[in-house]
UniProtKB/Swiss-Prot annotation:
Keywords: ANK repeat, Repeat
Organism expressing this protein natively: Acanthamoeba polyphaga mimivirus
InterPro entries reported for this sequence: Ankyrin_rpt, Ankyrin_rpt-contain_sf
Protein name from the UniProt record: Putative ankyrin repeat protein R96
Basic residues bias spans: 1-14
Chain segments carrying region Disordered: 1-37
């Protein structure tokens, strides 16, 4: 007995100590987990310490209470009697041992007492509130939910406990969905007390959590009870999108996904990824079955999932998934699967997914033309990728599809010959055999015009020369007997746009095999017109410009060439042409033949300067624009080389993302030239030039001449081909490496340095935004397109205008015999001329030099370079020639609040909104060289800061753009007398001056007179 007492004291001491520690905390610590054989095993989430209460008097007392309750229930068959006895027992227990109803209830659930529901009901009748049942601040009901103790949960809920946890981070639905408690989930939903779409603290719905943890039975239960599949998380993910992304990461073997798998599922799928994939697909099918439609983001993600070749899973799995989606949403095939508008059929072809391609072709109800005209449609892509069998199947089904509209004005024969760029890890090679078979299909079709030109000026034959083997070219020429019958454009050396000199074209591209074949077939040379009498084969000039020495030697041996060069004028022209535009020194041999000697020691600077000079003279591009274009492309090539080098050594670093996102995703023009180089040469609208295929080709040709031309051509063709299509980084890296561009990096850096030095030396800072290719000669002079009903037709007398402006003709030296004006201080002619840059004048007159220089070029050039004297006063500008006054321009008072505001009615401006950037070729033409057209050109340099009457009219050639009409009021010396009127400057929408004329005041439109009078 003493031993027992001693042990009891010791135990009591421990209990007392434990009680003191507990009293310091905010809430009493519930008796934790124990292993005493005489006590039942408690629930683990009640945090019970097994060792502390093996012989705890409280636990033993409670055990005694439980046994008494069990005895009462067993000994009494009457429920009412049993209830009365238990109530009496509880009352004695509470009074004797100071237990609360809550403590009794906690222990009921802690030890899973069999009749806990019955006892809870009795406790509630005694005043117990089940909603206040907590352990360490946590509701017992929530703990029971985590334990999936359904009987205990029912005992509490059926006796008044609220099944909703209130504002807790997760409710019972979230817990059941994430822990896969389908039975409890059904019970909770049957209560209809909780919103099935309620989100937890992380913004996730029960359905989203069930999908996240792949609890398929819970997914089905939630969907059957009306769960919304479109509920989004804070980062705008639906459960469908989450499953697609997760499956895509597994499919592409994303290394980060394995960490995510372990965090979600532990070791469950560590050795069985196929089971995981199967569960994801099953869950995804449940969700898709419940959807009414799919969002654009979900469609884009499905594209990457279903069309890319899987790495770690069977292709049939994603194929079956897409077929399932198609059965649910048949029209999804025509939805945009890329931001550019490619549909599902296009995407399957781009990714060479043969299973899906066959599936689409076999579906007879699909329309292979149903796509917007801005992108290539499916039939064009099938042709371009060389799927002969599928093409024949579709053509047999719908023969009219052969005349379908094509992007960039290509026909199906163009697509047959164009290169095929693939975007998957399994490239599709379009062989010569495939191309020839397709040529046979389309070349015999009467609905396809073999001489049709696309937007780049290419016929199918030019496309073949650029991309295909000689065998394909021979096959194509068999079916086209009219290929050489077109009218040829003379005075054009660059033969790409709208020209059919295919010998020159092949020479430019370095296709010696094509040139020799064409000569054997007696194809005629195009002749470049030197003057009215003498000509020279264009191909020879092209060979000189692009340094094709083997071509030059071949041409010089041909009778057609030697006959031309027998003429001294032609021979001298060729010699001068070579010395001016190439790195060849040309000598005349003893036999009076030409000997081309390559100057390998010529510096890059000299070669670049010659090439720039050639393109400036023949195509009207300014030196500044050409240098800017060269710098932009060379800088891009530097970046490609740098990124490629890093990718080669560090495949998983973000350098491949540069190649994917920066260069190829949105195309070289839209992204590279706009974003990467947006800070370059802001005074020049370089992007407009880079979007001009002719200018871009010219720039590529210049750089190609300085480095290896085929490499450069291939890379830019690749860039332009893939700009509209999704592409992964690895094919890009492999393609760049195969080109050998990295080996040219030092040369590229050197050339770019030279170009930038030339650019820095240039003092030109003029905005060359003029993309105008029209001369505007058809514009009618004095045709402002006014509505005459809006204005009065009053004419104003000289006296009225004189009184308003306070003018006195006597003070203007209008008398013919008046004394000459003395030289004006601070206005020396020499100083002004120094400000006029001849390059700027040449740029403004570049239209006069397209092809053959126009005869009146020298006249207008001289007028702009040799200006008269002028003096700017407060209220007027006086132009003179040191002897007499030539013109006077008066200042008008502007009442406009802004000068930038576009107005379709006449208004007085402080200075013009726009000014001259170039001259149309009708200016100073032979019928416009009278005194009224040729008033002092010095005004063209100074009136851009002077007040005028201005208004805008719609451009006749570009209806969405506007022309600017400017009227400067003043006087012009005409036959020795000063005549009042307006100096008229009309600019088209590209700021090209197409009308320059002085009108006497009575011939000025009345509405303009009215504005002058009112101001």
């Amino acid at each position: 007995m003493s031993t027992v007492k001693k042990s009891s004291k010791k135990k009591s001491s421990k209990k007392s100590s434990s009680g003191n520690e507990s009293s310091k905390k905010s809430s009493p610590k519930i008796v934790p987990k124990h292993t005493a054989k005489n006590l039942p095993k408690p629930i683990k989430n009640f945090e019970i310490d097994l060792d502390k209460c093996a012989n705890c008097p409280g636990c033993l007392t409670y055990l005694s209470f439980i046994r008494q309750v069990e005895n009462i229930i067993q000994q009494n068959s009457s429920r009412s009697t049993t209830t009365q006895l238990i109530v009496k027992l509880i009352s004695n227990f509470v009074w004797k041992y100071r237990f609360t109803y809550e403590q009794i209830a906690v222990n009921l659930f802690k030890y899973k007492f069999k009749e806990r529901g019955y006892l809870v009901k009795i406790l509630v009748s005694l005043g117990f509130d089940p909603n206040n049942l907590k352990i360490n601040g946590h509701k017992v009901l929530k703990i029971l939910v985590y334990e999936n103790d359904i009987p205990s949960i029912i005992a509490l809920v059926e006796n008044g406990a609220n099944i909703d946890f209130g504002k807790a981070p997760s409710n019972i639905l979230h817990i059941c969905a994430s822990r896969n408690y389908p039975v409890l989930l059904k019970y909770a939903l049957s209560r209809n007390e909780i919103d099935i779409n309620a989100v937890n603290i992380d913004g996730r719905s029960p359905l989203y959590l069930a999908c996240l943890y792949l609890n398929k039975e819970c997914i089905k239960i939630l969907l059957d009870n009306g769960a919304d599949v479109e509920v989004c998380t804070p980062d705008e993910k639906t459960c469908c999108l989450e499953l697609i992304i997760f499956l895509g990461n597994i499919m592409h073997n994303n290394l980060e996904v394995y960490t995510e798998i372990y965090q979600r599922y532990g070791d469950k799928y560590s050795d069985n990824i196929s089971e995981l994939v199967g569960n994801i697909v099953d869950a995804l099918k449940y969700i898709i079955s419940a959807k009414n439609n799919m969002s654009r983001q979900e469609i884009y993600t499905i594209r990457n999932l279903c069309f890319n070749k899987p790495i770690v899973m069977n292709e049939k799995i994603v194929f079956d998934l897409f077929v399932f989606i198609m059965d649910k949403f048949p029209k999804i095939v025509y939805n945009k699967f890329t931001h550019l508008g490619h549909n599902a059929i296009n995407t399957s072809i781009m990714f060479c997914n043969n299973s899906l391609i066959k599936y689409f072709v076999d579906k007879t109800d699909l329309d292979f033309q149903a796509i917007n005209n801005n992108i290539t449609n499916p039939i064009q892509m099938l042709v371009n990728h060389g799927y002969i069998d599928y093409v024949e199947t579709i053509l047999n089904r719908n023969p009219k599809i052969v005349s379908t509209k094509c992007r960039y004005n290509n026909n199906l024969l163009h697509y047959t010959l164009m290169p095929c760029y693939v975007y998957s890890n399994v490239p599709r090679i379009k062989s010569d055999k495939d191309i020839i078979e397709l040529v046979k299909i389309f070349a015999n079709n009467k609905k396809i015009n073999q001489n049709h030109r696309n937007n780049s000026g290419y016929r199918p034959i030019e496309v073949a020369i650029r991309y295909c083997s000689i065998d394909v070219i021979k096959e194509l020429l068999k079916y086209n007997t009219t290929i050489f019958a077109e009218n040829r454009i003379k005075q054009q050396l660059f033969p790409v746009l709208n020209n059919n000199d295919i010998i020159s074209f092949a020479t430019q591209l370095g296709r010696f095999d094509v040139v020799t074949y064409l000569i054997q077939e007696n194809v005629q040379f195009q002749l470049y017109q030197i003057d009215d009498i003498h000509t020279v084969p264009t191909a020879l000039l092209i060979a000189i410009v692009y340094h094709r020495k083997n071509f030059i030697q071949f041409f010089l041996e041909l009778p057609q060439i030697t006959d031309c060069l027998n003429n001294d004028v032609t021979k001298e022209y060729v010699i001068n042409f070579a010395n001016m535009y190439s790195n060849y020194n040309v000598q005349i041999t003893d036999t009076y033949n030409l000997n081309f000697i390559g100057n390998d020691k010529m510096s890059f600077t000299h070669r670049i300067d010659r090439m720039i000079h050639f393109y400036s003279v023949h195509y009207g591009y300014s030196k500044m624009v050409i240098l800017s274009g060269l710098s932009t492309i060379l800088s891009l090539l530097e970046k490609i080389c740098l990124a490629s080098k890093k990718c080669k050594n560090y495949r998983n670093l973000p350098n491949s993302k540069f190649l994917e996102a920066t260069i190829f995703s949105n195309g070289p023009c839209d992204l590279t030239f706009r974003n990467e180089f947006s800070n370059l040469y802001t005074d020049i609208n370089l992007l407009n030039y880079m979007n001009d295929s002719k200018f871009f080709d010219n720039i590529v040709e210049i750089i190609g001449d300085l480095i290896e031309y085929p490499i450069l051509l291939d890379i830019f063709e690749y860039m332009f081909a893939v700009r509209d299509l999704p592409i992964s980084s690895q094919p890009i890296i492999k393609f760049i490496e195969s080109l050998g561009l990295i080996n040219q990096s030092n040369k590229i850096i050197k050339i770019n340095k030279i170009v930038n030095e030339l650019l820095n030396k240039s003092e030109i800072s003029i905005d060359l935004n003029d993309q105008d290719t029209h001369n505007y000669d058809d514009y009618v002079e004095n045709d402002p397109e006014f509505d005459s009903d809006e204005f009065d037709t009053d004419e104003f007398s000289d006296e009225a205008i004189k009184d308003f402006f306070g003018l006195d003709n006597k003070n203007l030296l209008t008398d013919k015999t008046s004394s000459p004006i003395k030289p004006i201080k601070n206005n020396q002619k020499e100083n002004f001329n120094k400000k006029i840059d001849k390059y700027r004048v040449e740029n403004m007159l570049h239209k006069f030099c397209r092809g053959e220089k126009l005869p009146h070029y020298d006249i207008i050039y001289k007028c702009l370079m040799q200006t008269d004297y002028y003096q700017i006063l407060d209220n007027k500008i006086v132009v003179h020639n040191n002897e007499i006054i030539l013109a006077v321009i008066y200042k008008l008072k502007s009442s406009d609040s802004t000068n930038s505001q576009m107005s379709h009615k006449p208004s007085v401006k402080t200075n013009p909104s726009d000014w001259i950037k170039s001259y149309s070729t009708n200016i100073c033409s032979p019928n416009k060289q009278d005194h009224y057209h040729m008033f002092p050109f010095v005004l063209d340099w100074i009136l851009y800061k002077w007040s005028c009457v201005e208004f805008q009219t719609k451009d006749k050639i570009y209806p969405t753009e506007f022309n600017t009409h400017l009227y400067f009021y003043g006087e012009l010396n005409t036959n020795g007398r000063m005549v009042k009127g307006c100096f008229e400057y009309f600019l088209n929408c590209h700021k090209s001056l197409y009308h320059r004329l002085f009108h006497e005041i009575d011939r000025v439109p009345p509405q303009i007179q009215r504005k002058i009078y009112n101001h």
